[in-house]
């Protein structure tokens, strides 16, 4: 079998182990199609690595690699993969191509944390009020909800987030619902980072202002989100509001209500005019400012 037929995930896992080889011995590539045979043909017995080193390496793998490959190599790796410390931070984005029940998979990996889950990013349209409630039955510090999730309701989000008062980071991208930011802010008094982005759902992918597109999207100016943030999130340090319809009035309210704000991203917020006193105020208060017309090339959901 040719080298091109090797499993991508197996190659990824092997390369990580080779990086940790302190002996610096020359390694030869293999054309095997399985992770087990790849490892067996290597000079070094990777299974005999110290547990803490193995854990460090496995933590760098995707969920797909861990669930499909790593935990099946041997008993020791399976034991490590089932350790709750492996599941403190979870990102399900790499599981979008899985051909099985996403809900069951998500519940399974949440269960593996045994209540120790601190950070999770769920980028999947199968998300529902029920699954969100299940996820937030933990002491989360960071919650990311990406893509459009039509089966999640406004009340479902509020009820779920109300269960995690220690939440420090919240990211919501491409939401199909208007969030009750005031209720969320009051429920999470420790919130330091908020990312609320509509880019890709409501706005064109290019960085050009297109009034023909914008005029079909309902109210052209709306400061509801900005005023709710200003009123209920005084401890914010990092705020990202991409493709929001806030105006100068809303931005001024945020600067008044969030005195600790240091990072502000208002790309695609074309109802803001950063000139004069408002621009001066932002430059004096904000350490890192992303303006409405700045490029969104580094935005992970660009083109989604």
From Swiss-Prot:
SUPFAM superfamilies: F-box domain, RNI-like
Residue ranges of LRR repeats: 132-159, 173-198, 218-241, 243-268
UniProt xrefs under InterPro entries: F-box-like_dom_sf (IPR036047), F-box_dom (IPR001810), LRR_dom_sf (IPR032675)
Gene3D superfamilies: 1.20.1280.50, Ribonuclease Inhibitor
A Pfam family matched in the record: F-box-like
UniProt KW keywords: Leucine-rich repeat, Repeat
Alphabetical list of PROSITE patterns matching this protein: FBOX
GO molecular function, one term: SCF ubiquitin ligase complex binding
Protein name, as recorded: Putative F-box/LRR-repeat protein 21
Domain F-box positions: 43-90
Keyword Repeat belongs to the record: yes
């Amino acid at each position: 079998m040719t080298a091109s037929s090797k499993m991508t995930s197996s190659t990824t896992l092997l390369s990580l182990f080779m990086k940790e080889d302190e002996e610096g011995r020359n390694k030869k590539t293999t054309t095997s199609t399985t992770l087990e045979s790849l490892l067996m043909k290597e000079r070094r017995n990777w299974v005999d690595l110290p547990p803490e080193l193995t854990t460090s390496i496995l933590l760098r793998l995707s969920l797909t690699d861990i669930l499909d490959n790593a935990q099946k190599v041997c008993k020791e790796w399976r034991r490590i993969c089932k350790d709750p410390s492996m599941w403190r931070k979870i990102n399900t984005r790499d599981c979008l191509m899985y051909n099985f029940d996403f809900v069951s998979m998500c519940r399974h990996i949440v269960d593996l944390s045994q209540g120790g889950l601190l950070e999770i990013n769920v980028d999947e349209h199968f998300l529902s009020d029920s699954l969100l409630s299940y996820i937030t039955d933990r002491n989360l510090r960071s919650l990311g909800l990406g893509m459009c999730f039509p089966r999640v309701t406004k009340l479902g989000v509020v009820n779920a987030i109300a269960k995690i008062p220690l939440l420090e980071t919240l990211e919501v991208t491409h939401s199909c619902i208007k969030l009750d930011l005031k209720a969320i802010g009051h429920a999470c008094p420790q919130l330091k980072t908020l990312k609320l982005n509509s880019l890709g759902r409501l706005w064109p992918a290019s960085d050009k202002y297109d009034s023909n597109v914008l005029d079909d999207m309902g109210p052209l100016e709306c400061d509801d989100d900005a005023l709710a943030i200003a009123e209920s999130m005084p401890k914010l340090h990092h705020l990202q509001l991409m493709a929001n319809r806030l105006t100068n009035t809303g931005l001024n309210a945020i600067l008044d209500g969030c005195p600790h704000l240091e990072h502000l991203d208002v790309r695609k917020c074309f109802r803001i005019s950063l000139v004069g006193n408002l621009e001066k105020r932002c430059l004096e208060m904000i350490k890192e400012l992303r303006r409405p017309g700045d490029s969104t090339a580094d935005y992970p959901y660009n083109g989604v």
